[in-house]
Curated annotation (Swiss-Prot):
Taxonomic source organism: Drosophila pseudoobscura pseudoobscura
Family indicated by similarity: Belongs to the ubiquitin-conjugating enzyme family. FTS subfamily.
Organism placement in taxonomy: Eukaryota, Metazoa, Ecdysozoa, Arthropoda, Hexapoda
InterPro entries in the record: UBQ-conjugat_E2_core, UBQ-conjugating_enzyme/RWD
Domain UBC core: 15-179
Source organism superkingdom: Eukaryota
Name listed for the protein in its UniProt record: Protein crossbronx-like
Length: 262
């Protein structure tokens, strides 16, 4: 009996592993700019993520975050948990825990409707258009009607009533994230996203390796996952335009922003 139960658990774990791998492949297909996420080596349900912001109120910021998928993912309706490991000041991020409120745009998880990449686009959108993220509707005169409650009421009030003060505060945090961008990794997980200063010589060497037949042959076999993800920081106009394009239509003027995630 024990053997049978153990086999069942193994079968469920293997199936879930393939489903999570499919989620990661979907992210690659979406080709999102300036945001990266990868399952940790220790657990397929714990993802590491990082976002670089090049425009808007949060320009110059770099935020790390974790995505915790429910134990029964992708089944069930429980939403994943997103926790920022870099301090963020935003109406939708709880200051005590740095957890992100998904409720404004996700009423519940539906595996046939949502994927992990939707979470990443949502993260991009709240930073690209923080004012749009707290707007419930727009009046005929063009005025925004803001939420009455949010995870961070102080940030909500400041963004609604004093944009200049809000921008100043988040820009102070942006400088802090720049200062600590290359800090020593806080996790020894092989899949932790390591950020290093751009080195043209190293970049050229890696690109040549990727083009070599031996590299293509080695990576065509699913024997072992990559040990590191190296993110190149590029603040060029092209990346800014791509980032803006990703989130421009996410928040609809009529307040039904969730439709943009479909």
């Amino acid at each position: 009996m024990w053997f049978s139960w153990n086999n069942t658990e193994q079968s469920i774990a293997v199936r879930q592993g393939y489903q999570v791998l499919a989620e990661y492949q979907l992210i690659e297909q979406e080709q999102l700019k300036n945001i990266y996420a990868i399952p940790s080596y220790a657990s397929a349900l714990h993802w590491f993520g990082v976002i670089f912001i090049h425009s808007g109120f949060y320009a110059g910021s770099m935020f790390r975050f974790s995505i915790i998928l429910p134990d029964n993912f992708p089944n069930g309706t429980s939403l994943p948990t997103i926790i920022f490991t870099t301090t963020c000041y935003h109406p939708h991020i709880r200051p005590q825990t740095q957890s992100l409120d998904l409720a404004p745009f996700f009423t519940g998880w539906r595996k046939d409707h949502y994927h992990v990449w939707h979470l990443l686009k949502y993260i991009q959108a709240i930073f690209a258009d923080p004012e749009g993220s707290i707007s419930t509707t727009v009046t005929p005169s063009g005025d925004r009607v803001c939420l009455e409650e949010a995870y961070n009421m102080d940030a909500l009030a400041m963004l609604s009533n004093d944009r200049v003060a809000f921008i100043k505060k988040v820009q102070e945090l942006a400088l802090f994230t720049k200062k600590h961008m290359y800090d020593k990794p806080t996790s020894n997980d092989p899949h932790y996203i390591v950020i290093e200063p751009f080195c043209s010589e190293r970049h050229t060497k890696i690109m040549e390796q990727l083009k070599s037949p031996s590299w293509k042959e080695a990576t065509s076999m699913d024997t072992s996952p990559p040990a590191q993800c190296l993110a190149r920081i590029d603040s060029s106009r092209q990346m800014d335009e791509e980032e803006a394009k990703q989130s421009a239509k996410l928040f609809a003027k009529n307040g039904k922003a969730a439709a943009a995630l479909q």
